Curated annotation (Swiss-Prot):
The keyword Lyase applies. The active site is at D65. It is an enzyme of class 4 (lyase). It comes from Brucella canis (strain ATCC 23365 / NCTC 10854 / RM-666). GO terms for molecular function: methylglyoxal synthase activity. Substrate binds at H12, K16, T38, G39, T40, T41, S59, G60, H92. GO terms for cellular component: cytosol. This is Methylglyoxal synthase. Catalyzes the formation of methylglyoxal from dihydroxyacetone phosphate. Its EC number is 4.2.3.3.
Length: 125
């Protein structure tokens, strides 16, 4: 049995609505993959897209970013879609840098904004 690709979905507070809209627009495509998301983002997506089975980890500031980073390092998350808000001060900026660094170290496809995420999901489909 082949394992399904696992995609991580994360969004900063000011980008959560955009992530929900993205997930809703691509619900059919995303349903073919295992989805992991940080707590609040995952809950919002699950409410908007009930057909998606989302594994929720802790909220980002409570360690969810690190949990997903560990999954990247273990090879159990193969794609990262992280809608970053570049205009808001990030109190957990170190966590963001650590997560995107791991995405680069382990050479996984990574989208940090909706335009790139749109292209990435179409390429996976």
């Amino acid at each position: 049995m082949t394992q399904r690709l696992r995609i991580a979905l994360i969004a900063h507070d000011q980008k959560k609505d955009d992530m929900v809209a993205f997930a809703r627009a691509h619900e059919q495509a995303l349903s073919r993959y295992d989805i992991v998301a940080t707590g609040t983002t995952g809950g919002l997506i699950q409410d908007a897209c009930p057909s998606l089975n989302i594994h929720r980890v802790k909220s980002g500031p409570l360690g969810g970013d690190q949990q997903i980073g560990a999954m990247i390092a273990e090879g159990t998350v193969e794609v990262l879609i992280f809608f970053i808000d570049p205009l808001s001060p990030l109190p957990h900026d170190v966590d963001v840098k650590a997560l995107t660094r791991l995405g680069s170290v382990y050479d996984i496809p990574m989208a940090l904004n909706r335009a790139t995420a749109e292209k990435l999901v179409r390429a996976l489909d």
